[in-house]
Amino acid sequence: MYQLFRHGIFQMDAEKAHDFTIQCLKLASNPLFQPILKSLIHAPKGFPKTVMGVNFPNPIGLAAGADKNGDAIDGFGTLGFGFLEVGTVTPVAQDGNAKPRQFRLIEAEGIINRNGFNNNGIDYLIENVKNARYKGVIGINIGKNKFTSLEQGKDDYIFCLNKAYNYAGYITVNISSPNTPDLRQLQYGDYFDDLLRSIKDRQAILANQYNKYVPIAVKIAPDLTESELVQIADTLVRHKMDGVIATNTTVSRDTVMGMKNAEQQGGLSGKPLQHKSTEIIKRLHQELKGQIPIIGSGGIDGLQNAQEKIEAGAELLQVYSGLIYHGPKLVKELVKNIK
């Protein structure tokens, strides 16, 4: 059945297809349609897992970027995910980069996007999170507005942290999108140190204010040198971050040279990222020595490579591009088998 749906949406522009899918899932979020979708999907329960002090119904999650504004939380939830990461969201709504900005690499099962954090702003997202009936864990992925300077960047993250804290199962600090100018600079040196220090200080204040501890993860890029990765791991440990998501999209085109759309600028996700993200997880796991849990993301399209990420050191997994190419059966297969 999904093959038929996929055939239809693949005739559309990639972003229009995405928006259409979100509208379908939003419709499926309606209590009238939920039982129908549930009976069609037959989502398995999976294996509960506690990571970052949070109880996840199962270790399979939806990666950020799929539901930027939290418009289809209950629809995605019906597919069987143990957790959903919504966002990336910024303090103020922004349009993102010029269209077209999403491109399929069908033969490689990849996607290139240069969206640029297009979203309706944190307040809009929080309303959707508050209204969701989904019983799994909701992570909120936060970023900075394009017009905010690097020097003022941490203020945007603190602003979003304040708004999201009371409504999130966990919060992700996204400093690794390649589509916001200079954003990845926040992963390095004094910027990184300063950002994490500010975030941890604010987390302590909010934990006291709301009388609950909400863990904070950092999402990193796959395009790191050995020394950069070591430095990032050291900084994460030093600031006692609660988790790390490895990885975001890649700017490399090594695996897709010569393919249609490969020349498009932006971050490449899907199968071409599979090996690279697993290698980063492996190296990160060696550096972190179990002190900080890893959430694995990047090119998961089946049980075998999902298992490879677990063996490399990931405790939770996230999918997005694989869902586009393989449909709900991918989620079902992973939830049924991954512990």
UniProtKB/Swiss-Prot annotation:
Q: How does it sit in the membrane?
A: Peripheral membrane protein
- Highest taxon, organism lineage: Bacteria
One biological process term from GO is:
'de novo' UMP biosynthetic process
Query: Which residues hold substrate?
Result: 68, 113-117, 174, 179, 248-249
Q: Which InterPro entries match?
A: Aldolase_TIM, DHO_dehydrogenase, Dihydroorotate_DH_1_2, Dihydroorotate_DH_2, Dihydroorotate_DH_cat, Dihydroorotate_DH_CS
Q: Where in the cell is it found?
A: Cell membrane
Record keywords: Hydrolase included?
Answer: no
Positions contributing to FMN binding: 64-68, 88, 141, 174, 219, 247, 270, 299, 320-321
* Ranges that cross the membrane: none
Q: What's its EC?
A: 1.3.5.2
How the cofactor is bound: the record states: Binds 1 FMN per subunit.
What is the enzyme's main class? oxidoreductase
Q: Which GO terms describe its molecular function?
A: dihydroorotate dehydrogenase (quinone) activity
Catalytic reaction annotation: (S)-dihydroorotate + a quinone = orotate + a quinol
Named cofactor requirement(s): FMN
The record's GO CC annotations read: cytoplasm; plasma membrane
**Pathway in which the depicted protein is active:** Pyrimidine metabolism; UMP biosynthesis via de novo pathway; orotate from (S)-dihydroorotate (quinone route): step 1/1
Concerning Pfam families, the annotation shows:
DHO_dh
What are the UniProt keywords, alphabetically? Cell membrane, Flavoprotein, FMN, Membrane, Oxidoreductase, Pyrimidine biosynthesis
PANTHER family for the chain: DIHYDROOROTATE DEHYDROGENASE (QUINONE), MITOCHONDRIAL (PTHR48109:SF4), DIHYDROOROTATE DEHYDROGENASE (QUINONE), MITOCHONDRIAL-RELATED (PTHR48109)
Subunit organization: Monomer.
In terms of NCBIfam families, this protein maps to: PRK05286.1-1, PRK05286.1-2, PRK05286.1-4, PRK05286.2-5, pyrD_sub2
Q: Which family does the UniProt entry place this protein in?
A: Belongs to the dihydroorotate dehydrogenase family. Type 2 subfamily.
Q: What does this protein do?
A: Catalyzes the conversion of dihydroorotate to orotate with quinone as electron acceptor.
- Protein name, as recorded: Dihydroorotate dehydrogenase (quinone)
Where does this protein come from, organism-wise? Haemophilus influenzae (strain 86-028NP)
Gene name of the encoded protein: pyrD
